[in-house]
Regions:
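C-terminal subregion of chymotrypsin/trypsin-like serine protease catalytic domains
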Residues: 1-4, 48, 218-284
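A conserved glycine-rich beta-strand in the N-terminal activation segment of trypsin-fold
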Residues: 21-41, 256
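Short, solvent-exposed loop/turn segments that connect beta-strands within catalytic domains
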Residues: 18-24, 37-38, 80, 195-197, ...
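A short, Trp-centered hydrophobic/proline-enriched beta-strand micro-motif
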Residues: 2-19, 69-71
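Serine endopeptidase catalytic core focused on the charge-relay Asp
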Residues: 6-8, 27-28, 35, 58, ...
């Protein structure tokens, strides 16, 4: 079992109804945690928290409703297995969505958002995503790290056609819960070129509704060849890195989907960034 399968969280967005009426489920999504024990952030897509399209800002619900809170299904340990621990997180202070509790980029087209949740509920399995990018040194067993020269401290490249994975719950189907579905997603556009002048790129993957907000991972298994600088490197260690946040397909008839880079995520949550990280976009 890969422990990262527990790292993608099943989310439901809800509208709070006034006057004693039942609350309305707006839809399923996926999220994940970044941060440190006792100080976590819940990450998903902007449109999951806002209930609006990221391209034009229009409300997505046919009833004209937007989320007031989300329910997150965490995995708790019980009798050698897992039990669901459902936690509600309000998205706003008060009843009328005035003061939002979550962060997002100034440009809503960068479809990511993060909500500070702090410590997890008691008994929950803590499975957060890594916040560092691997280097060649990480391909060697830990006992051999020190003997490697400084040349191996170069970051592993991310290139078009490289294989990535989107971890989530397609169509909101939690039949595999608490383990997420790993959807293979080759890189379909040049990662460094951006997407519409924004910090993202395209994946070629049959992702579906319910996977919005999912973590996108690079996962290299032991023995898989890694090409760096024209050299083919065979290795004994598995390497995993958080590449970004998946936010959905560019069109309902297309299998091309958008992923926003981890740097764009750290721009809104610098508290969870690795030591020495610096923003890539100018700040005032």
């Amino acid at each position: 079992m890969n422990t990262l399968s527990l790292g993608a969280l099943y989310i439901e967005s809800w509208h709070h109804s006034l006057g004693g009426a039942e609350d309305t489920l707006l839809g399923p999504a996926t999220g994940f945690l970044i941060g440190f024990p006792g100080d976590y952030w819940l990450v998903t897509a902007w449109h999951v928290f806002s209930g609006r399209r990221s391209d034009n800002g229009k409300i997505m619900s046919k009833k004209g409703l937007c989320p007031d809170y989300v329910r997150v299904r965490f995995a708790g340990t019980a009798d050698g297995g897992f039990q669901p621990i459902i936690q509600r997180y309000d998205l706003y202070d008060g009843e009328f969505q005035y003061n939002r509790r979550w962060r997002s980029p100034d440009d809503r087209r960068i479809d990511i958002a993060a909500l500070h949740i702090g410590a997890l509920p008691e008994g929950v399995v803590e499975a957060s995503m890594p916040n560092t990018w691997p280097t060649l040194r990480d391909l060697f067993p830990p006992e051999r790290h020190a003997e490697q020269a400084s040349e191996v401290d170069v970051a592993l490249p991310l290139r078009v056609t490289d294989k990535l994975f989107v971890l989530g719950f397609p169509f909101g189907d939690a039949g595999t819960w608490p383990f997420a579905v790993w959807t293979v997603a080759p890189v379909a556009s040049e990662p460094l070129a951006g997407w519409n002048d924004l910090p993202g790129f395209l994946l070629d993957s049959r992702t579906r509704e319910g996977q919005s907000g999912a973590p996108v991972l690079m996962h290299i298994r032991p023995g898989e060849p890694v090409v760096v600088g024209g050299d083919v490197i065979m290795h004994d260690e598995s390497v995993t890195a958080l590449v970004g946040v998946y936010s959905g397909r560019i069109h309902k008839e297309s299998d091309l989907g958008k992923v926003w880079t981890v740097d764009a995520l750290f721009e809104i949550v610098p508290e969870a960034a690795p030591p020495g990280w610096k923003p890539t976009s100018p700040r005032d």
